[in-house]
A protein has these predicted regions:
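Sec-dependent N-terminal signal peptides
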Residues: 4-13
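Short, compositionally stereotyped local motifs that mark structural "simplifiers"
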Residues: 21-23, 736-830
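Accessory carbohydrate-recognition regions in carbohydrate-active enzymes
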Residues: 23-358, 362-461, 469-495, 501-504, ...
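Short proline/glycine-enriched turn/loop motifs at strand-loop junctions of beta-rich domains
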Residues: 167-169, 687, 766-772
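Surface beta-strand/loop "capping" patches
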Residues: 653-677, 744-764
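Short strand-turn-strand beta-turns centered on an Asx-Gly dipeptide
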Residues: 670, 694-697, 777-779
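Surface-exposed interfaces of beta-sheet-rich extracellular modules
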Residues: 681-698, 772-773
Length: 830
């Protein structure tokens, strides 16, 4: 019997192992999730968010205004202020440029049209944060100077302001249509003693914004006074007086519309109608609770959970609905259109949000992602281009790239296809083939020369990534010629890489921009310096590694990035914030960098840096966001990273694994499935990954695929306090690599004076030392470059590279001979 006992024991273990594992339980709420949202996060520092009431992706943002201008007043509110000018119905969240603040109302005790910003008597009032409350869908504050309590709540296109006046005080409501933006035209119509309507057309970031409104007072006004007696024009203000013997409370129901006054009326009638303030608030908060339940987390740290759900909230207040309840909207041609098939949106901050916010939406907002893309294509029909940064039917001309393209490609390759795919691909190619914003030079040379366009390095790099996403969609559609064209363009990053410095650097047609300082903020980069753009090759990290000279070189450059001095030189750039060395988390070009360590077999360094950013650069305080929140992008980084992964390369269908922050998190998908993430033993100390299991199987890979998430299941991390060997094998690291249709990079002049006295010696080089260089002087026959040569007269030098029968673009540079008696002195810091 003894000799059979080990066999029986082994059989028992085997049978036990064969039993189906119990499913991993989903994360559970321990309270209302809206209780974890702190809308004041981001209202201080440079976050540029607002605390007022709004609905998920809603048209109305009903919020207090404490600032009339200034960079830190972009949202209309800053936590450091102690005076309120009033409560307006539209606001931007986290942007770096001001706009909105439309249709200001302010309850007060006297008829006064001056806002008080000039220090003279006005309708503004002091307030204290001790008597201020902000929740999803609700805001309340006490106005100290007039002893009035104000409460705000909203539906999607309408809202209610409720004022509680003190006993016996005079009851006055000021309507200011001149507030903040330059007014192009405005009008106020008195329909009855309880209803008024009108419009305001204004100019700021949006150069021709049109907004209509309709207001219903809960009791009739007894008198109305107009500034200078005017009800039309650029300075329309009105004061409405009410009988204070008929109760201390006045509510104002407001509907807004980009279409017309009828639209504004229908919007509030259908959304609010006869509902009470409390009913509207309750409905708003129930909708917010349902939205936040898309991801449920468990953890012991209250601040971390507050940061998470506030981040969820911030990713859901833009883009904004831009059509009335009847489907009508104002298009990019400023004409009125109608759609019944999808919701039409505005406020697409795509240079920011294509990186993480839109990838997050492909997980938790797939239906809305279809609406976003249908909106892009409709704007393409109306205005001739897809949005870059659109605002209220206006093109702002702000930011770079054509980042509607990766949003579409990412969605399409993830199976989100509720739109006209052929039109989408046509619009994507149209974005890439225009001759504006440096694209003409980019197509001709394979890069944008400094002398041709500002922000040339950033544009070259971002265009190259966008082109890669077009190539991926072309490949999926079987469009081989387009695939080749755009895959070649995706490699144009090679033409702005300087092998001597290992940085991405501005170049004239044939020569590098000099002198070069990677710390310098100048016109070659977008809101950044070379440190902050030199790692931007998400589409071909392997190719970038080859340029640098190997994985150890990329690792070394990343190490230097995070320990470099955190000062910049050159132009002062307010956007460069949240610095760890030269890593600038407060601005988007840095957002993928910490995850690049996974590509060089050092995932523990990604885990260290990601956890540092999560816990140091996001806090439960008004200044708890380290830069402009940027319409959800800063928050989306936090959400994805705290779950344990990030979208380094949208359209690759991969998320790179970092360091999960919570014990358990469940993503409740629109398809009815749940994906649960468990981090066993996670703590502030235990930030390193020991092992990972995906659906019960060992997962040695330092990335996860999108299909694994949307299929439902579980991802289990075992965390520890020391770096491990997990994810370090070459077979298990993420790879993005362009392997076919390889280009020949454009040669450059490594030595030689473009303007010279006597003569100059010219040395040519290429990023690829194995390619051949050919040159021609003054249209003579091309010669193989074999070494430095002299130029002693004015000459036109043409060069190109060649390898394996492929040629680079031909680039021409004119050399000028200077009179030796002429002296040139440059007096510029650039």
């Amino acid at each position: 019997m003894k000799r059979y006992f080990p066999l029986l024991l082994l059989l028992v273990f085997f049978l036990d192992a064969c039993k189906p594992k119990p499913p991993i339980s989903s994360a559970q709420k321990d309270r209302q999730l809206i209780d974890y949202v702190n809308p004041f996060i981001g209202t201080g520092g440079h976050g540029h968010t607002y605390p007022g009431a709004t609905m998920p992706f809603g048209m109305m943002q009903l919020s207090p205004d404490t600032r009339l201008d200034g960079w830190d007043g972009c949202s209309g509110y800053h936590y450091s202020d102690n005076e309120i000018f009033g409560f307006s119905h539209t606001h931007l969240s986290g942007t770096g440029v001001s706009d909105y603040g439309d249709i200001l109302l302010m309850p007060t005790n006297k008829v006064v049209f001056n806002n008080g910003a000039d220090g003279k008597d006005g309708y503004k009032s002091k307030f204290s944060h001790d008597k201020e409350i902000a929740e999803p869908g609700f805001y309340k504050v006490h106005l100290e100077d007039t002893n009035i309590d104000v409460e705000l709540t909203v539906s999607e296109r309408s809202g209610i302001q409720k004022y509680q006046f003190a006993d016996g005080s005079k009851q006055v409501i000021i309507l200011d249509l001149e507030h903040r933006d330059e007014v192009l035209d405005s009008k106020l119509t008195i329909n009855s003693k309880t209803e008024i309507s009108g419009h305001r057309f204004s100019k700021a970031w949006a150069t021709d914004q049109k907004l209509f409104f309709d207001m219903l007072f809960s009791k009739p006004f007894t008198k109305v006074t107009f500034l200078d007696g005017k009800t039309e024009g650029k300075k329309v203000k009105a004061a409405f007086e009410f009988d204070n013997t008929t109760g201390n409370e006045i509510s104002v129901t407001v509907g807004i519309s980009p279409v017309d006054e009828e639209g504004a009326i229908h919007n509030w009638q259908l959304e609010i109608g006869s509902k009470s303030f409390e009913q509207v608030k309750k409905e708003a908060q129930e909708i917010w609770e349902k939205q936040l339940e898309k991801i449920v987390i468990e953890g012991d740290n209250f601040d971390y959970k507050t940061n998470f759900y506030t981040s969820m909230y911030h990713t859901m207040i833009a883009p904004n609905l831009y059509q009335d309840v009847d489907g009508r909207y104002r298009g990019m041609d400023l004409k009125i259109h109608e759609t019944k098939d999808f919701d039409y949106y505005t406020v697409f901050s795509l240079w920011d949000t294509y990186r993480a916010a839109h990838p997050l939406y492909t997980i938790i907002e797939q239906d809305r992602t279809n609406d976003f893309i249908n909106t892009f294509l409709t704007k393409y029909d109306e205005g001739g281009i897809m949005p870059i940064w659109d605002l209220s039917a206006c093109y702002t001309g702000c930011m770079i790239g054509y980042h509607a393209v990766p949003v579409i490609a990412d969605a399409y390759l993830k199976g989100i296809r509720g739109y006209d795919v052929d039109k989408a691909f046509e619009a994507m190619k149209h974005s890439a083939t225009r001759d504006k914003l440096g694209l003409d030079s980019y197509k001709q040379f394979g890069f944008i020369p400094v002398e041709k366009e500002s922000e040339s390095v950033s544009k070259t790099l971002e265009y190259a990534y966008d082109d890669w996403t077009i190539a991926q969609m072309a490949k999926s559609l079987g469009k081989d010629n387009d695939y080749k064209i755009y895959l070649e363009r995706a490699q144009n990053y090679k033409n702005v890489f300087d092998p001597s410095s290992l940085f991405m650097r501005g170049r004239f047609r044939n020569t590098w921009f000099a002198p070069f300082d990677p710390y310098e903020v100048n016109f070659n980069y977008t809101e950044a310096n070379s440190w902050q753009y030199s790692f931007y090759v998400p589409q071909d990290v392997s190719g970038f590694i080859k340029l640098l000279g190997g994985k150890d070189k990329l690792e070394g450059q990343l190490d230097k990035l995070f320990v470099a001095e955190n000062n910049t030189s050159g132009r002062h750039q307010v956007d460069i914030t949240g610095l760890i060395g030269q890593y600038a988390h407060g601005n988007e070009p840095s957002h993928h960098m910490a995850y690049l360590y996974n590509f060089v077999n050092k995932p523990h360094k990604t885990q260290e840096k990601v956890r540092q950013i999560l816990t140091e650069l996001y806090t439960n305080t008004p200044d708890g966001i380290s830069g402009n929140e940027d319409c959800g992008q800063m928050s989306a980084w936090y959400i994805l990273s705290s779950l344990g992964f990030y979208s380094v390369t949208p359209a690759s269908n991969q998320y790179i694994i970092g360091s999960p922050l919570f014990k358990r998190a469940s993503i409740n998908l629109e398809n009815g499935k749940t994906f649960t993430i468990v981090a066993d033993s996670v703590s502030d100390k235990n930030k390193y990954i020991k092992s990972v299991q995906l659906n019960g199987k060992n997962h040695p890979y330092s990335y996860i695929n999108h299909k694994d998430i949307v299929a439902g299941g579980d991802l289990i991390f075992e965390m520890t306090d020391k770096p491990t060997s997990w994810g370090t094998d070459n077979k298990h690291i993420p790879v993005t690599e362009i392997k076919e249709h390889l280009i020949v990079s454009t040669p450059f002049i490594a030595k030689g004076e473009i303007a010279f006295k006597g003569s100059t010696e010219v040395t040519l080089k290429s990023v690829d030392s194995s390619s051949k260089i050919y040159y021609s002087l003054d249209d003579n026959e091309y010669k193989l470059y074999e070494g430095p040569f002299m130029i002693s007269e004015k000459s036109d030098l043409k060069v190109y590279g060649e390898k394996d029968g492929e040629k680079s673009a031909v680039v021409t540079t004119t050399f000028y001979k200077i009179d030796p008696n002429v002296k040139i002195e440059l007096k510029t810091e650039y």
